[in-house]
From Swiss-Prot:
The keyword Ribonucleoprotein does not apply. The gene is PHO11. This is Acid phosphatase PHO11. InterPro entries: Acid_Pase_AS, His_Pase_clade-2, His_PPase_superfam, Histidine_acid_Pase_euk. Its EC number is 3.1.3.2. GO terms for molecular function: acid phosphatase activity. It comes from Saccharomyces cerevisiae (strain ATCC 204508 / S288c) (Baker's yeast). Gene3D superfamilies: Phosphoglycerate mutase-like. It catalyses: a phosphate monoester + H2O = an alcohol + phosphate. GO terms for biological process: phosphate-containing compound metabolic process. Keywords: Glycoprotein, Hydrolase, Signal.
Length: 467
């Protein structure tokens, strides 16, 4: 009911959408000026490099030779999901029907403001040059993927110089598929690339990039009792401040929370968002930690199912590493969702699982997990296998930064010696059982991830889903 009502509201506001210019001249001075808040948007905003790079060079250590590269990437910048858009449009309706003159932080709404969701067909979808609110927007998912492709060629181009035909893998989410295709486009026309579209339906079982979708035991509300302890009074403070500046507006804590999503997704679509300017720095910090907390306990180390779910992809990754000498394909590129990447990183052990996050306060000294550092829109996790003299090593590069394995980083470039890595990986997956923990057999007969090995005969081409 709400969905229909909100869509009706939006439709009415879009009657003259065809006459709306793609941005205004005044936008030029604002676009690209809000990068400092990206780390506080919980991964909903544009891509940025991992801040904790430890000063380690991204370059291949001297006198070493790359043997294999794997990448698991998140789709690029997008419009909000349908469910998130409901909240944003409900709050927009409240603002658009305010009869007074806006004052204070909301005064920009007096200046012929154009709501950034101009067509509901864009919900769930990648932002592109065609659907962006402003043609000058530098943060579209389309351009991010193409930049990523150019960065890939600069860093690893020699790995595909003599391999003109290879596969790229994506979940059958429309936005993931679009990201993969834009990435392929960014590589240029030198390569003959086969895009394999892998189902993320629960019936895919283990043969998927999105194992949590194949997990009937997955609980979206797990650990809510912990999360409810987090102090969210700052949200009512935002609402009260804006209401005081604008008598009769009657914003709620829910509206205040929605403004953070509005801020992030408007930047994705427009290149900047005046809504972002309503927050104090303290409020951004409190919101950001709330996102860290929710992620840690619902898609990260704080949820005991996650390590088994992430093992589905991690086991396949380790198998590819072991077969690097016999596999013709030396580069393995995949695109999926943030949840899948977080599950994967949890199993690897890159995300600290020894110290649970507290909901009692913001732990500035002890908090080593920041959701947006790992999974901004367009996130990418690279696994590098390289040989130096007679020894071989593995290391991870997350969003442009080398992130060492804490207990295995004595190799060149803070890498992990290959046999030590295999021992480490075995310990990480010990006790995990994706099929059993998730009760996969109740929804699928597929018990193994095989698409990396059988794509050339099966030719995966699942129907795209708008999610």
């Amino acid at each position: 009911m709400l969905k229909s009502a909100v869509y009706s509201i939006l439709a009415a506001s879009l009657v003259n959408a065809g006459t709306i210019p793609l941005g205004k001249l005044s936008d030029i001075d604002k676009i690209g000026t809000q990068t400092e808040i990206f780390p506080f948007l919980g991964g909903s905003g544009p891509y940025y490099s991992f801040p904790g790079d430890y000063g380690i060079s991204r370059d291949l250590p001297e006198s070493c030779e790359m043997k294999q590269v794997q990448m698991v990437g998140r789709h690029g910048e997008r419009y909000p999901t349908v469910s998130k858009a409901k909240s944003i449009m409900t709050t927009w309706y409240k603002l658009s029907n305010y009869t007074g003159q806006f004052s204070g932080a909301l005064s920009f709404l007096n200046d012929d403001y154009e709501f950034f969701i101009r067509d509901t067909k864009n919900l769930e979808m990648e932002t592109t040059l065609a659907n962006s609110v402003n043609v000058l927007n530098p943060y579209t998912g389309e351009m991010n993927a193409k930049r990523h492709a150019r960065d890939f060629l600069a860093q690893y181009g020699y790995m595909v110089e003599n391999q003109t035909s290879f596969a790229v893998f994506t979940s059958n989410s429309n936005r993931c598929h679009d990201t993969a295709q834009y990435f392929i486009d960014g590589l240029g026309d030198k390569f003959n690339i086969s895009l394999q579209t892998i189902s993320e339906a629960e019936s895919a079982g283990a043969n998927t990039l999105s194992a949590h979708h194949s997990c009937p035991a997955w609980d979206d509300d797990v650990n809510d009792d912990i999360l409810k302890k987090y102090d969210t009074k700052y949200l009512s403070g935002i609402a009260k401040r804006l209401n005081k500046e604008n008598k009769g507006l009657n914003l709620t804590s829910s509206d205040a929370n929605t403004f953070f999503a509005w801020c992030a997704y408007e930047i994705n679509a427009r290149g900047y968002s005046d809504i972002c300017n309503i927050f104090t720095k303290d409020e951004l910090v409190r919101f950001s930690y709330g996102q860290d907390l929710e992620t840690y306990y619902q898609t990260g180390p704080g949820y005991d199912v996650v390590r088994s779910v992430g093992a589905n992809l991690f086991n396949a990754s380790v198998k590819l590493l072991k077969e690097s000498e016999v596999q013709d394909q030396k580069v393995w590129l995949s695109f999926t969702h943030d949840t899948d990447i977080l599950n994967y990183l949890t199993t690897i052990g890159i995300i600290d699982d020894k110290n649970n996050l507290t909901a009692e306060h913001v732990p500035f000294m002890e908090n080593t997990f920041h959701r947006s550092w790992y999974v901004p829109q367009g996130a990418r996790v690279y696994t590098e296998k390289f040989q130096c003299s007679n020894d071989t090593y593995v290391r991870y590069v997350i969003n442009d930064a080398v992130v060492p394995i804490e207990t295995c980083s004595t190799g060149p470039g803070f890498s992990c010696e290959i046999n030590d890595f295999y021992d480490y990986a075995e310990k990480r997956v010990a006790g995990t059982d994706f099929l059993k923990v998730c009760n996969v057999s109740s929804v699928s007969n597929s018990t193994e991830l095989t698409f990396f090995w059988d794509w050339n005969t099966k030719h995966y081409n699942d129907t795209l889903l708008k999610q």
